[in-house]
Amino acid sequence: EKINKHPLKDATFFQDTYAGTESVLYTVKAREGKTESSYQLPANAPLGYLNIPLNRPEDGTTPSGQNYFYAPNDASIGDVDGDGEYEIILKWDPSNAHDNSHDGYTGEVYVDCYKLSGKLLWRINLGRNIRAGAHYTQFMVFDFDGDGKAEVVMRTSDGTVDGKGKVLGNAKADYREPGVFDKKKNKLTRQGRILEGNEYLTVFSGLTGEALYTTDYIPARGNPKDWGDTRANRSDRFLACIAYLDGVRPSVVMCRGYYTRIVLAAFNWDGKKLNKHWVFDTNIPGNEKYAKQGNHNLRVGDIDGDGCDEIIYGSCTIDHNGKGLYSTGLGHGDAIQLTQIDPARKGLQVTNVMAVLIGMLPPEKSSCNSRVPGI
Protein backbone atom coordinates (compact mmCIF):
# COMPACT_ATOMS: atom_id res chain seq x y z
CA GLU A 1 0.00 0.00 0.00
CA LYS A 2 1.34 3.39 -0.95
CA ILE A 3 1.26 5.58 2.13
CA ASN A 4 2.69 8.87 0.84
CA LYS A 5 1.85 11.00 -2.17
CA HIS A 6 5.39 12.29 -2.60
CA PRO A 7 8.87 10.83 -1.97
CA LEU A 8 10.01 11.10 1.64
CA LYS A 9 12.86 13.42 0.77
CA ASP A 10 11.88 15.99 3.38
CA ALA A 11 10.94 13.54 6.16
CA THR A 12 12.96 11.63 8.69
CA PHE A 13 10.33 9.22 10.00
CA PHE A 14 6.85 7.80 9.39
CA GLN A 15 4.38 7.32 12.23
CA ASP A 16 1.95 4.44 11.77
CA THR A 17 -1.48 5.22 13.23
CA TYR A 18 -2.67 1.60 13.01
CA ALA A 19 -4.08 0.61 16.40
CA GLY A 20 -5.09 -2.99 15.71
CA THR A 21 -3.94 -6.03 17.64
CA GLU A 22 -2.68 -8.07 14.70
CA SER A 23 1.04 -8.11 13.94
CA VAL A 24 2.22 -5.84 11.15
CA LEU A 25 5.02 -6.51 8.68
CA TYR A 26 6.87 -3.54 7.19
CA THR A 27 8.87 -3.83 3.97
CA VAL A 28 11.04 -1.34 2.16
CA LYS A 29 11.40 -1.76 -1.60
CA ALA A 30 13.51 0.07 -4.12
CA ARG A 31 11.48 1.66 -6.91
CA GLU A 32 12.55 3.24 -10.16
CA GLY A 33 9.68 4.80 -12.02
CA LYS A 34 6.79 2.34 -11.93
CA THR A 35 8.97 -0.73 -11.51
CA GLU A 36 9.54 -2.21 -8.07
CA SER A 37 12.57 -4.30 -7.31
CA SER A 38 13.88 -6.13 -4.28
CA TYR A 39 16.72 -4.75 -2.18
CA GLN A 40 19.60 -6.98 -1.19
CA LEU A 41 22.19 -6.24 1.46
CA PRO A 42 25.49 -7.68 0.23
CA ALA A 43 27.46 -9.93 2.56
CA ASN A 44 30.38 -7.50 2.63
CA ALA A 45 28.25 -4.40 3.21
CA PRO A 46 29.91 -1.69 5.32
CA LEU A 47 28.90 -1.51 8.97
CA GLY A 48 26.62 1.28 10.11
CA TYR A 49 29.14 2.26 12.75
CA LEU A 50 32.87 2.62 13.35
CA ASN A 51 34.65 0.05 15.48
CA ILE A 52 37.44 2.00 17.20
CA PRO A 53 39.95 -0.01 19.26
CA LEU A 54 40.80 1.55 22.62
CA ASN A 55 43.96 1.42 24.72
CA ARG A 56 42.69 0.58 28.19
CA PRO A 57 44.83 1.90 31.09
CA GLU A 58 46.43 -0.67 33.36
CA ASP A 59 44.66 -1.84 36.51
CA GLY A 60 45.72 -0.32 39.81
CA THR A 61 45.56 -0.59 43.60
CA THR A 62 44.61 2.15 46.08
CA PRO A 63 46.58 2.95 49.26
CA SER A 64 43.91 0.99 51.16
CA GLY A 65 44.63 -2.12 49.08
CA GLN A 66 41.57 -2.02 46.84
CA ASN A 67 42.10 -3.19 43.26
CA TYR A 68 40.42 -1.38 40.39
CA PHE A 69 40.20 -1.49 36.60
CA TYR A 70 39.19 0.99 33.91
CA ALA A 71 36.18 1.46 31.64
CA PRO A 72 35.50 4.15 29.01
CA ASN A 73 33.29 6.94 30.33
CA ASP A 74 32.36 10.38 28.98
CA ALA A 75 33.52 11.43 25.52
CA SER A 76 33.53 14.57 23.41
CA ILE A 77 34.55 15.36 19.84
CA GLY A 78 36.67 18.00 18.16
CA ASP A 79 38.90 18.44 15.13
CA VAL A 80 42.25 18.62 16.90
CA ASP A 81 44.51 18.51 13.82
CA GLY A 82 42.52 20.65 11.38
CA ASP A 83 42.02 17.91 8.79
CA GLY A 84 38.23 18.33 8.73
CA GLU A 85 37.60 15.06 10.57
CA TYR A 86 36.58 14.80 14.20
CA GLU A 87 38.74 13.12 16.80
CA ILE A 88 37.31 11.58 19.98
CA ILE A 89 38.42 12.78 23.42
CA LEU A 90 37.60 10.02 25.91
CA LYS A 91 37.68 9.97 29.70
CA TRP A 92 38.58 6.74 31.48
CA ASP A 93 37.07 6.22 34.93
CA PRO A 94 38.27 3.56 37.38
CA SER A 95 35.87 0.95 38.74
CA ASN A 96 36.12 2.58 42.18
CA ALA A 97 34.98 6.03 41.03
CA HIS A 98 32.81 7.64 43.69
CA ASP A 99 29.92 10.01 43.96
CA ASN A 100 30.77 13.08 46.03
CA SER A 101 28.57 11.81 48.85
CA HIS A 102 30.73 8.68 49.28
CA ASP A 103 34.08 8.27 51.02
CA GLY A 104 36.88 6.20 49.54
CA TYR A 105 40.02 6.33 47.45
CA THR A 106 39.67 6.28 43.68
CA GLY A 107 42.02 5.41 40.87
CA GLU A 108 43.45 8.15 38.69
CA VAL A 109 41.47 9.62 35.79
CA TYR A 110 42.85 9.44 32.25
CA VAL A 111 41.81 11.45 29.20
CA ASP A 112 42.70 10.10 25.73
CA CYS A 113 42.47 11.47 22.20
CA TYR A 114 41.76 8.99 19.38
CA LYS A 115 41.66 9.29 15.63
CA LEU A 116 38.65 7.55 14.09
CA SER A 117 41.13 4.94 12.86
CA GLY A 118 41.89 4.07 16.50
CA LYS A 119 45.28 5.78 16.60
CA LEU A 120 45.97 7.17 20.08
CA LEU A 121 47.27 10.73 19.74
CA TRP A 122 47.88 11.36 23.43
CA ARG A 123 46.95 10.50 27.00
CA ILE A 124 46.63 12.86 29.96
CA ASN A 125 46.80 11.49 33.51
CA LEU A 126 44.96 13.86 35.85
CA GLY A 127 46.84 12.39 38.80
CA ARG A 128 46.02 11.35 42.34
CA ASN A 129 44.73 14.79 43.33
CA ILE A 130 41.74 14.78 40.97
CA ARG A 131 39.15 12.39 42.37
CA ALA A 132 37.28 10.09 39.98
CA GLY A 133 33.51 10.40 39.71
CA ALA A 134 30.72 11.83 37.59
CA HIS A 135 30.82 15.30 39.13
CA TYR A 136 34.56 16.02 39.25
CA THR A 137 35.95 16.32 35.72
CA GLN A 138 34.12 18.33 33.07
CA PHE A 139 36.43 18.62 30.06
CA MET A 140 35.57 21.16 27.36
CA VAL A 141 36.67 20.52 23.76
CA PHE A 142 36.43 23.37 21.25
CA ASP A 143 38.43 25.59 18.92
CA PHE A 144 38.56 28.52 21.33
CA ASP A 145 41.07 30.69 19.46
CA GLY A 146 39.80 30.13 15.91
CA ASP A 147 42.97 28.53 14.52
CA GLY A 148 41.07 25.57 13.10
CA LYS A 149 42.23 23.14 15.80
CA ALA A 150 40.35 22.28 18.99
CA GLU A 151 41.81 22.71 22.47
CA VAL A 152 40.87 20.88 25.68
CA VAL A 153 40.19 22.78 28.91
CA MET A 154 39.73 21.12 32.30
CA ARG A 155 40.54 21.24 36.01
CA THR A 156 43.95 19.86 37.00
CA SER A 157 46.13 19.71 40.10
CA ASP A 158 49.64 18.98 41.31
CA GLY A 159 50.72 15.69 39.77
CA THR A 160 48.71 15.95 36.55
CA VAL A 161 50.78 14.60 33.63
CA ASP A 162 50.13 16.16 30.22
CA GLY A 163 50.23 14.43 26.83
CA LYS A 164 53.95 15.14 26.50
CA GLY A 165 54.80 13.54 29.84
CA LYS A 166 55.32 16.82 31.70
CA VAL A 167 54.14 16.94 35.32
CA LEU A 168 52.17 20.00 36.43
CA GLY A 169 53.10 21.50 39.79
CA ASN A 170 54.46 19.36 42.61
CA ALA A 171 54.68 15.73 41.50
CA LYS A 172 55.01 14.52 45.12
CA ALA A 173 51.91 16.29 46.44
CA ASP A 174 49.18 14.03 47.79
CA TYR A 175 46.06 15.84 49.01
CA ARG A 176 43.95 12.71 49.62
CA GLU A 177 42.57 12.35 53.13
CA PRO A 178 43.91 9.23 54.92
CA GLY A 179 40.65 8.98 56.83
CA VAL A 180 39.37 9.60 60.35
CA PHE A 181 37.78 6.89 62.49
CA ASP A 182 34.27 7.87 63.56
CA LYS A 183 33.44 6.15 66.86
CA LYS A 184 29.72 6.86 66.58
CA LYS A 185 29.51 5.37 63.09
CA ASN A 186 32.18 2.76 63.89
CA LYS A 187 33.88 3.27 60.56
CA LEU A 188 36.60 5.23 58.79
CA THR A 189 35.29 8.46 57.26
CA ARG A 190 36.62 11.02 54.75
CA GLN A 191 39.18 8.58 53.38
CA GLY A 192 40.17 9.46 49.82
CA ARG A 193 38.43 12.82 49.81
CA ILE A 194 40.32 15.92 48.68
CA LEU A 195 39.52 18.84 50.97
CA GLU A 196 42.54 21.07 50.34
CA GLY A 197 45.43 21.61 47.97
CA ASN A 198 46.10 23.39 44.71
CA GLU A 199 43.59 23.35 41.88
CA TYR A 200 44.45 24.58 38.40
CA LEU A 201 42.65 25.36 35.16
CA THR A 202 44.69 24.13 32.21
CA VAL A 203 44.40 24.58 28.45
CA PHE A 204 45.79 21.58 26.57
CA SER A 205 46.71 21.30 22.91
CA GLY A 206 44.11 19.12 21.26
CA LEU A 207 46.76 17.83 18.86
CA THR A 208 49.47 16.80 21.32
CA GLY A 209 47.90 16.94 24.80
CA GLU A 210 50.61 19.39 25.85
CA ALA A 211 49.68 21.80 28.64
CA LEU A 212 49.70 25.20 26.92
CA TYR A 213 48.63 27.37 29.84
CA THR A 214 47.86 26.75 33.51
CA THR A 215 46.43 29.16 36.06
CA ASP A 216 44.75 28.93 39.46
CA TYR A 217 41.33 27.36 39.19
CA ILE A 218 38.34 29.65 39.42
CA PRO A 219 35.87 29.03 41.05
CA ALA A 220 38.28 28.25 43.89
CA ARG A 221 37.43 25.75 46.64
CA GLY A 222 38.37 27.97 49.54
CA ASN A 223 36.94 26.63 52.77
CA PRO A 224 34.57 23.71 52.05
CA LYS A 225 32.34 24.99 54.88
CA ASP A 226 31.48 27.98 52.70
CA TRP A 227 29.64 25.58 50.37
CA GLY A 228 27.50 23.91 53.02
CA ASP A 229 29.45 20.97 54.44
CA THR A 230 32.95 19.90 55.49
CA ARG A 231 33.41 16.85 53.24
CA ALA A 232 33.36 18.49 49.78
CA ASN A 233 30.05 16.94 48.78
CA ARG A 234 28.81 20.41 47.87
CA SER A 235 32.03 22.26 47.07
CA ASP A 236 33.16 19.66 44.52
CA ARG A 237 30.07 19.64 42.31
CA PHE A 238 31.42 20.88 38.99
CA LEU A 239 29.76 21.87 35.72
CA ALA A 240 31.14 23.55 32.60
CA CYS A 241 29.97 24.80 29.22
CA ILE A 242 30.91 26.67 26.07
CA ALA A 243 28.96 29.82 25.28
CA TYR A 244 29.13 32.70 22.82
CA LEU A 245 28.77 35.31 25.54
CA ASP A 246 29.55 38.23 23.24
CA GLY A 247 27.82 36.64 20.26
CA VAL A 248 31.11 36.42 18.36
CA ARG A 249 33.70 34.22 20.02
CA PRO A 250 33.40 31.11 22.21
CA SER A 251 34.07 31.35 25.93
CA VAL A 252 34.61 28.48 28.33
CA VAL A 253 32.60 28.75 31.55
CA MET A 254 33.68 26.73 34.59
CA CYS A 255 31.06 26.27 37.30
CA ARG A 256 31.09 25.09 40.90
CA GLY A 257 28.27 24.25 43.27
CA TYR A 258 24.51 23.98 42.95
CA TYR A 259 23.06 22.85 46.28
CA THR A 260 24.08 26.02 48.14
CA ARG A 261 26.67 28.50 46.89
CA ILE A 262 27.02 28.82 43.10
CA VAL A 263 29.99 30.30 41.24
CA LEU A 264 30.49 30.60 37.47
CA ALA A 265 33.69 31.92 35.87
CA ALA A 266 33.97 32.74 32.15
CA PHE A 267 37.28 32.73 30.25
CA ASN A 268 38.51 33.49 26.74
CA TRP A 269 41.53 31.74 25.18
CA ASP A 270 43.52 33.85 22.70
CA GLY A 271 46.04 31.16 21.80
CA LYS A 272 48.56 32.27 24.42
CA LYS A 273 46.69 33.20 27.57
CA LEU A 274 43.45 32.35 29.33
CA ASN A 275 41.77 35.66 30.09
CA LYS A 276 39.11 35.93 32.78
CA HIS A 277 35.95 37.51 31.39
CA TRP A 278 33.69 37.60 34.45
CA VAL A 279 32.80 35.76 37.67
CA PHE A 280 29.29 35.29 39.07
CA ASP A 281 29.12 34.38 42.77
CA THR A 282 25.99 33.97 44.88
CA ASN A 283 28.00 35.13 47.91
CA ILE A 284 28.19 38.61 46.38
CA PRO A 285 25.51 40.91 47.83
CA GLY A 286 22.56 41.12 45.46
CA ASN A 287 23.00 37.57 44.16
CA GLU A 288 21.62 35.76 47.19
CA LYS A 289 18.40 34.63 45.47
CA TYR A 290 20.45 32.60 42.96
CA ALA A 291 21.89 30.34 45.66
CA LYS A 292 20.56 26.76 45.90
CA GLN A 293 19.13 26.92 42.35
CA GLY A 294 21.63 24.73 40.49
CA ASN A 295 21.05 21.45 38.67
CA HIS A 296 23.22 18.45 37.93
CA ASN A 297 23.37 19.95 34.44
CA LEU A 298 22.91 23.21 32.56
CA ARG A 299 21.87 24.52 29.16
CA VAL A 300 23.15 27.33 26.94
CA GLY A 301 21.14 29.46 24.52
CA ASP A 302 20.16 32.98 23.52
CA ILE A 303 16.90 33.27 25.42
CA ASP A 304 16.37 37.03 25.19
CA GLY A 305 17.18 37.52 21.51
CA ASP A 306 20.16 39.82 22.03
CA GLY A 307 22.50 37.67 19.93
CA CYS A 308 24.46 36.48 22.98
CA ASP A 309 24.20 33.22 24.90
CA GLU A 310 22.79 32.95 28.39
CA ILE A 311 23.39 30.07 30.81
CA ILE A 312 20.35 28.25 32.18
CA TYR A 313 21.75 27.10 35.52
CA GLY A 314 18.95 24.94 36.83
CA SER A 315 16.23 27.13 38.30
CA CYS A 316 18.02 30.37 37.47
CA THR A 317 19.66 32.01 34.47
CA ILE A 318 22.91 33.95 34.24
CA ASP A 319 23.01 36.64 31.54
CA HIS A 320 25.80 36.86 28.96
CA ASN A 321 27.46 39.68 30.92
CA GLY A 322 27.83 37.63 34.10
CA LYS A 323 24.86 39.24 35.84
CA GLY A 324 21.89 37.35 37.19
CA LEU A 325 18.96 37.47 34.76
CA TYR A 326 16.32 35.76 36.90
CA SER A 327 15.81 33.15 39.60
CA THR A 328 12.60 31.16 39.94
CA GLY A 329 13.41 30.13 43.49
CA LEU A 330 12.30 26.56 42.76
CA GLY A 331 15.60 25.09 43.90
CA HIS A 332 17.67 22.11 42.82
CA GLY A 333 16.63 19.93 39.89
CA ASP A 334 17.97 16.83 38.17
CA ALA A 335 17.34 17.25 34.43
CA ILE A 336 16.77 20.30 32.28
CA GLN A 337 16.03 21.04 28.63
CA LEU A 338 15.97 24.31 26.71
CA THR A 339 14.11 24.46 23.40
CA GLN A 340 10.92 25.75 21.83
CA ILE A 341 8.72 23.21 23.55
CA ASP A 342 5.50 25.02 22.62
CA PRO A 343 5.59 25.93 18.90
CA ALA A 344 2.67 28.31 19.42
CA ARG A 345 4.58 30.32 22.00
CA LYS A 346 7.24 32.82 21.06
CA GLY A 347 10.77 32.21 22.27
CA LEU A 348 12.46 29.31 24.04
CA GLN A 349 11.10 27.40 27.00
CA VAL A 350 12.67 25.45 29.85
CA THR A 351 11.50 22.18 31.33
CA ASN A 352 13.15 21.11 34.57
CA VAL A 353 12.71 17.85 36.49
CA MET A 354 12.88 18.90 40.12
CA ALA A 355 14.49 16.92 42.92
CA VAL A 356 11.91 18.04 45.49
CA LEU A 357 8.12 18.20 45.51
CA ILE A 358 7.20 21.80 44.84
CA GLY A 359 3.42 21.39 44.68
CA MET A 360 1.10 23.49 42.55
CA LEU A 361 2.74 26.57 41.11
CA PRO A 362 0.99 29.92 40.82
CA PRO A 363 0.28 31.07 37.25
CA GLU A 364 3.22 33.46 37.15
CA LYS A 365 5.62 30.58 37.85
CA SER A 366 3.87 27.83 35.91
CA SER A 367 4.86 29.49 32.64
CA CYS A 368 7.43 27.61 30.56
CA ASN A 369 8.75 30.76 28.94
CA SER A 370 12.37 31.19 29.99
CA ARG A 371 12.33 34.87 29.04
CA VAL A 372 10.63 35.56 32.36
CA PRO A 373 11.10 34.01 35.79
CA GLY A 374 9.25 30.81 35.01
CA ILE A 375 9.59 27.11 34.52
Where are these regions (language model features)?
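Recognizes extended acidic, P/S/T-rich segments that occur
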Residues: 1-23
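Extracellular fibronectin type III
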Residues: 31-48
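Beta-strand-rich domains and repeat architectures in extracellular enzymes and scaffolds
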Residues: 53-99
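Repeat-based blade/solenoid architectures
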Residues: 55-74, 127-138, 220-239, 283-298, ...
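Beta-propeller blade termini
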Residues: 73-80, 137-145, 149-151, 239-245, ...
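Acidic/hydrophobic-patterned starts of short beta strands in beta-sheet-rich repeat architectures
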Residues: 82-92, 146-156, 246-256, 305-313, ...
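Short, conserved, GDST-rich strand-edge loop motifs in beta-rich repeat architectures
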Residues: 90-108, 155-195, 252-254
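Beta-propeller blade signature
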Residues: 107-117, 173-176, 196-207, 264-270, ...
